[in-house]
Amino acid sequence: EVANLAGGGAAGGIGATLYSLFNASLENGISMILNSVNFDTLLSDTQLVITGEGKIDNQTLMGKVPFGILQAAKKKGVKCVAICGIYSPSKELEECGFEKIIEISPRDLPLEEVMQKNNATRNIESCIIKFINSMR
């Protein structure tokens, strides 16, 4: 029963265990977090939300943070941009509603180099500046 439990995957192992042993309820993690910080209220005077993840692929659409933020932003009519280290494009991602998905890591650099704090910071800043300038 627990093996097929929605939300009981790798990140939900503890939740699935508590569910099976103590009849605990399972809640979507990003929904719980967004509700706890009143994210809808924070969006009231917002024009753009920038979110991110290490890798954006079809798994992102299965309840991960960027997709939860996108859904909340869409409900309020707020544009949402995602930044990521690696982007694996798909039709589903192209149609899900992100204004733009920006891959920040140059593919020709080794992962160790890309992950260095100075390089990562520079890559993020550069991509965000280019995106903002493209909006003008």
Can you annotate each of these PLM segments?
Residues 1-136:
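N-terminal loops that bind phosphate or other acidic moieties
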